Amino acid sequence: MPSEGSQQPSLDSFFKRKNPRVEPYSRTGNNAIIDLTDSPPNKKIKLDDEGSQKNRSMTQTSSSYFKGHPTARPLSVDKRLPRKPSAAIQAYKLQDVIPPQPSHSGLAFETCSLVPQASFVPDSQPEPSASPAPQRTTEQLKRHEEWKTRILAMSGSFRRKRSLALDEAVAAEAREAAGLEDEGTPFDGSDGDDYKSESEKNAEEVGKQLKKYVAKELAGKGKSKGKKKEEIGPSGLAYTPLEKQFMEIKEQNRDVLLLMEVGYKYKFHGEDAKTASRELGIVAFPNRNFFTASIPTHRLHIHVKKLLSLGYKVGVITQTETAALKKIGDNRNAPFARKLTHLFTAATYVEDPSLSSSSSSSSSVRFDDPVVPGTAPPPTNALVAIVEQPVDRASDDRVKVGLVCVVPGTGDITWDEFDDSQIRTELETRLAHLSPAELLLPKQRLTKATEKVLTYFAGEPKHRGRNAVRIERIDNIPEYDAAFDFLTNFYHCKEHKATVSKGDVNDERHLMTEGNKQWSLQPKLSQDGADISLDEEIYLASGVSSSKAILTLVDFPKQVVISMAVAIRYMKRFGLENAFKHTSSFVRFANRSHMLLSSNTLANLEIYQNQTDGGLYGSLIWLLDHCKTRMGKRLLREWVGRPLLDVAALKARADAIEEIMENNSYHMEKLRSLLINMPDLVRGLTRVQYGKATPNELATLLITLVRLASEFKPNMGNVFRSCLLNNIPNTLPTILDTSQRFLNALNLKQARENDVANLWADPDRFPDIQDVKDCISVCEMELNEHLMELRKILKKPTLRYITVSGIEYLVEVPIRDTKIVPAQWMKISATRTVNRYHTPKILAITKERTQHLEKLSIVAREAFIAFQSEVAEYHELVVVSKQIAVIDCLMSLAQTAAASGYCKPKFVAEPELKILAGRHPMVEMLREESYVPFDIHFSKEEGTTKIITGPNMAGKSSTVRAMALIVCMAQIGSFVPAASVTLSVHDSVQTRMGASDEIGRGKSTFMVELSETSDILQTITPRSLVVLDELGRGTSTYDGIAIAYATLSHIAEIGCNTLFVTHYPTVAQDLAREKPDKISNWHMSFDEIQMPDGGAEITFLYQLTRGLQEASFGVWCARLAGLPKPILDTAQMRSSSLKAETQERLRGIVARRVGWMLHNLFDNKTSSSQVLRNVEMLHNSLSSSSISFSQ
């Protein structure tokens, strides 16, 4: 046996790390109880005083302080203790610790640890007098006392910890540390044989239980022995059934972040857990073979939305059986059945209420949060599918792009095909308008230029305050023929496939326009031969039939057909393909009825977001948006970004706004009241179209539609002057009967509780539901009859079934009456006072009833989906909802127009733009100071090009932005901030302002400047409005002047209305002199006061005035910016010096020019008229150079 001193430190360190907690061993009377309640076997060993010695020799303990059996052989130190105690139970195999004994049948096991008692000393040790204890040194005694205090002098109550089955040497070391080394034993072992058989029996029973428990706790090597290699996880442990479920679903959804419902939590596993921990800020920890992270069920929808906003695809795995049903089912020992029931991306998430526990049945359903006027329009969450084809096979510079955009939440679909240049400006413009949340792109990649634009756009939200844009790569993009066949099958028009050709259906009416290479949908023939168009289809009451849908396919360009097939195939995975059902929702992006604002114009004019932080505050949509409904906010955003080109439509909107402002009649007030507490009807009806609405949602929709339809009586006639306003009272009554009929079909009380099984007011509407209910009623009747029998058996006339923890039809019997309970009854649960049972008959009937309940759930859900499909067929409900949104937008614009100083614009046929007392709409609202108005007039008589010069910070950029915004607002149909505005319809507003680089796209500041200018020159027409701010400043002075001069000269020849801001006076002077009928000079006025120190103090007047102004007063702006005075003084001196040098050079040039003129005059080589022209040119040069003849 190792010496005490050598072994004490190792034992001390071992127990210090493990920190065992041991229950004290106690004796009462003649019996001793070893309590194993905390261990899985839940056994208690009863020991009497006579047989305790032999029993202890068998139940050798790991932390016992008694000496073991005299025949126990000691183990070596290396085998006795693990070198790394953290290896826990896995390092110890009990059969190696306790040697097999002949009388013990080779049994090896472990028992609980016992705190030593003074009266128990093994008889194998000699008496103290015969064998004195070895003498200890002072250091050993001190260490001994500390150890004894640590073991015995604590609270006295040590909870039992799993034994590690230490060998006899360690046990002896523990006894010695406890001071029991020299104690003897009162047992002589004479009666051991009489107790031996019972002791062995108890020991074997306990040993078997403990071996089973220890085997369960052993790590991979022991547990996984005999398992197939694929069943063993990375930790060496076999995969659990739950882990196998996750792996099976993950194998089919590798690109999805999965949440698995486990009890009252949703869990992430593996790499998904690490991702969730990083993005959601939750803890991920290793658990068997995977990392695990979890969230509570009531927070699921919050975390799902956050993950979607970060660009992830999220799947939700739910339990398809309840705990109560599982307990009485045949698979009670198997894991819960689970499957992937929800799959979302940012674009396809349509606010599924089944994920939100916050939507109670008693609360009124709102499909969006309450609308706050002035807040941002709801995100469209658009999905955009893009394909392309190079125009020239030899080069990828120019491509033909096909684009389909679908908004799953509203069902709106936008499509387009267009040719794009090398820098993909057209594509960028469409992305800026559509603002997609997700892009569907071919996996084999697009052209390099296109990929660069898409990558930049997807990464831009980090800097523009938007959510991340997700990119989904699609395999196997179909060819045109395959895509056409796919769409044909989708619209169920197989009967037309043989008769409708892909290229010869009314070719003369569906030809490609050769001029702009764009397809347009012209009127086409329906089956009855009548002409129809997409605009007319929008107002068809019954929606668009599948036969008409297939006829529209031949009108779509080839790239659009391919994009649409890709989008529909992708949407099918989410169950949202019905968004393409109604072709009346199809709109072409670029058409002749709307102005196309480029992405640069949207940014420079701050249409959707400000340029300061990318937020809503200070933008045009912020100024105009006073909508009361979500659908109104979405429509207004579309209006603002796509101004009208149709004068009749513009006048209709302006007239409606004017009447709203002036009319306070009863009917107008009723029209305003329609918008109060209005849910998002468009989004709600779209969810009905998908079959994803809840009964509560559907009831809310129908109640709202009935309320709207009841506000106006049929055949009221025109109660308003405006045709737009009259659409509501004329259309609303037409949906009353339909809405009321659908509403009457529902049991409202059950609908509010989302009770699908009892939803229908007429039980015979869906007979399958009633048949299943009848079967359930038979089962319940049999259970009631069986209850009568149970009352007789138990002699309890008042006996009733009870339900506990979701388990129904329990028979509760007091403990005192359990003797009369038949042996066939199954005990389900118990308390201290009662037992609860299921009889065999109850088990059989409830199993049958459970099957009927599951069938009822399926049948009722199918019936509700069929009812939603029936509602969705009535497309006029969506049309009326969109008209409500139109009224909301008009009311919002009227509220803006009510501000002082706004006027109704006047449209004229001839090209003209005349603004009197115009103001910047947003600056006027943001600043407390009054805005200084401006006057401007563009016409053939007044010229179409205005060059604006003047000092920095004088208001040049603000003024030109205000002019462009007034044009945009006028063509939205809104009133404008001016005293008077007369204008013709502009087909585009093009702007080139500011200076910034695009490093991500490989463009310098000057390259960006020239690229934007190039796009403008390629798209403008004589009816465009162009704003160019300081073109040419990104390069050297000479190159900048040359580019500015050439560009402005070219634009002036086109004849479009142009505002050109520059600090190059030479350009302004030369062009105004060369083209006086088209170009005129203007500047922002100021006052200059000379100071005693030789400097000047500048006061900006912010007034637009005719004439040229050379001075920029850059040093004065530097003074306003707070630059140090020494720098300002140096800059002023250098500026004066450079100005003097320039004037000196000009004097030399003038002197040489005068000498040349006089020489030619006296030599009679120049005519008098030529001399006069030369003198005039010289005078102009002197004037522009601030050099007088006297100088």
From Swiss-Prot:
Q: What Pfam families does the annotation carry?
A: MutS_I, MutS_II, MutS_III, MutS_IV, MutS_V
Does the keyword DNA-binding feature in the UniProt annotation? yes
**From start to end residue, where is composition biased (Basic and acidic residues)?**
139-148, 193-203
Where do the record's region annotations for Disordered lie? 1-82, 118-148, 175-203
Question: Where, per UniProt, does this protein localize?
Answer: Nucleus
Give the Polar residues compositional bias ranges.
Answer: 1-11, 54-65
Tell me the GO BP annotations in alphabetical order: mismatch repair; mitotic recombination
Ranges of Low complexity compositional bias?
A: 122-135
- Record-linked InterPro entries: DNA_mismatch_repair_MutS-lik_N, DNA_mismatch_repair_MutS_C, DNA_mismatch_repair_MutS_clamp, DNA_mismatch_repair_MutS_core, DNA_mismatch_repair_MutS_N, DNA_mismatch_repair_MutS_sf, DNA_mmatch_repair_MutS_con_dom, MutS
Q: Which UniProt keywords are given for this protein, alphabetically ordered?
A: ATP-binding, DNA damage, DNA repair, DNA-binding, Nucleotide-binding, Nucleus
Per its record, what are the GO molecular function terms? ATP binding; ATP-dependent DNA damage sensor activity; mismatched DNA binding
Binding positions for ATP per the UniProt entry: G950, P951, N952, M953, A954, G955, K956, S957
Q: Which GO terms describe its cellular component?
A: nucleus
Superkingdom of origin: Eukaryota
Q: Where is this region: Mispair-binding domain?
A: 233-347
Q: Which PROSITE patterns match?
A: DNA_MISMATCH_REPAIR_2
Report if keyword DNA repair is assigned. yes
Function, as annotated, reads: Component of the post-replicative DNA mismatch repair system (MMR). Heterodimerizes with MSH2 to form MutS beta, which binds to DNA mismatches thereby initiating DNA repair. MSH3 provides substrate-binding and substrate specificity to the complex. When bound, the MutS beta heterodimer bends the DNA helix and shields approximately 20 base pairs. Acts mainly to repair insertion-deletion loops (IDLs) from 2 to 13 nucleotides in size, but can also repair base-base and single insertion-deletion mismatches that occur during replication.
What is stated as this protein's family in its record?
Answer: Belongs to the DNA mismatch repair MutS family. MSH3 subfamily.
The annotated subunit structure for this chain is: Heterodimer consisting of MSH2-MSH3 (MutS beta). Forms a ternary complex with MutL alpha (MLH1-PMS1).
Name by which UniProt lists this protein: DNA mismatch repair protein MSH3
Origin organism is Cryptococcus neoformans var. neoformans serotype D (strain B-3501A) (Filobasidiella neoformans)
Its taxonomic path starts at: Eukaryota, Fungi, Dikarya, Basidiomycota, Agaricomycotina
